């Protein structure tokens, strides 16, 4: 809201179109020379009533509002109802959803009204509150994404340096909101209402502007440069570096601090009987292998989802960030000739900011199996489809049962008991891709493990 002010929209209009009322081609700058009612009808017809392309914008905002509100509420409900989903990362995701809900409810409707009617109808108090809440939401989103990246970086790249806990995550969330509320106070202080038509200021609120009033040229430039660096460029660069290291660790190197992938050598079959308990030890080692591979797959899926969330955030906030800097710092768009294009860019950049709030739940649905199951359960409940309690419990035990089933199948092979007691560490880089073969896969094939079972086991 604060990034695109009403004068940008007003500047796109050609006031000489008032020649319908005035036969001269001079700009219509003195509305008091005409009948007030006639002038207000003219304003409604030419400026306030939505044009054809603006109806498309309205439809886009409605879709974003519904998806963002329902999707982010479902994210919060899913984590609240399921204790197994209350992880450190999911706590931060819930905080991100809360910020999206806040900006969707408080800021999206006001932004749409201003973009269409070019008027601030909400008074002086909300002129300070709504832009302030929007900037707070942006700050919360950026800091939350930064905390997620930092948490994943420590957990995967330096697990022995820092231990993430749910309590620390909750404390971090409180700090995020406090810091965001404090650093955005200047935004609330400088926002004021003013009329673009002083002659009708006492008769109508049309073309009332909610904009920044700094009282100087240096302060807004300094503020918006700092705002761009603190809320976009610097965090984005740091998060990109963090995820690059995470990518190298998960896809190219061994994950330090985790249990290593277990590999065993064949042993010559001895005529003597095996010691008591050796079969159970073999089963335990096989279970360790399954657990390790499952952990790798889970971490890769989580990292992939978070990288997509960061990418979408960077894309959605890039246009408005650039336009803000160009307008507030370099003074562009004040006397531009192509005002329709400028207006289109600002309105589209507004829509992208809110579309980011709607995109996050969609990303969770496609890239997180747990969130997808909870979303399906919620929609099924709303549609009146009732599942047995056992079906719901089965979803919570899916990962455990699949691992047990996998261990049981492998332990049934006769050659499992011939596995050596010797355990060696192997790098995660030896793990095969889904359609490739590596040293670990070749070794299992030599032990007689069927390729069909192995492809399912080692899928990443």
UniProtKB/Swiss-Prot annotation:
Residues carrying sugar: 14, 22, 202
Annotated region (Required for response to orexin-A), positions in chain: 33-49
Cytoplasmic side: 76-88, 151-170, 244-304, 367-460
Membrane-protein topology: Multi-pass membrane protein
Transmembrane residue ranges: 55-75, 89-110, 128-150, 171-191, 223-243, 305-326, 343-366
Tissue-level expression: Widely expressed. Isoform 2 not detected in skeletal muscle and kidney.
Disulfide bond recorded as keyword: yes
Record carries keyword Glycoprotein: yes
Site for Important for responses to orexin, residues: 44
Any one GO biological process: phospholipase C-activating G protein-coupled receptor signaling pathway
Cysteines paired by S-S bonds: 127-210
Membrane-side (Extracellular) residue stretches: 1-54, 111-127, 192-222, 327-342
Main localization of the protein described in the UniProt heading: membrane
CDD domains: 7tmA_OXR
Keywords per UniProt: Cell membrane, Disulfide bond, G-protein coupled receptor, Glycoprotein, Membrane, Receptor, Transducer, Transmembrane, Transmembrane helix
GO terms of molecular function: orexin receptor activity; peptide hormone binding
Alphabetized Pfam families for the sequence: 7tm_1, Orexin_rec2
GO CC aspect terms: nucleoplasm; plasma membrane
PANTHER family per the UniProt record, alphabetical: G PROTEIN-COUPLED RECEPTOR 15-LIKE, LEUCOKININ RECEPTOR-RELATED
Domain remark text: The N-terminal region is required for orexin signaling.
Family: Belongs to the G-protein coupled receptor 1 family.
Function field: Nonselective, high-affinity receptor for both orexin-A and orexin-B neuropeptides. Triggers an increase in cytoplasmic Ca(2+) levels in response to orexin-A binding.
Protein name: Orexin receptor type 2
Originating species: Mus musculus
Taxonomic lineage from the root: Eukaryota, Metazoa, Chordata, Craniata, Vertebrata
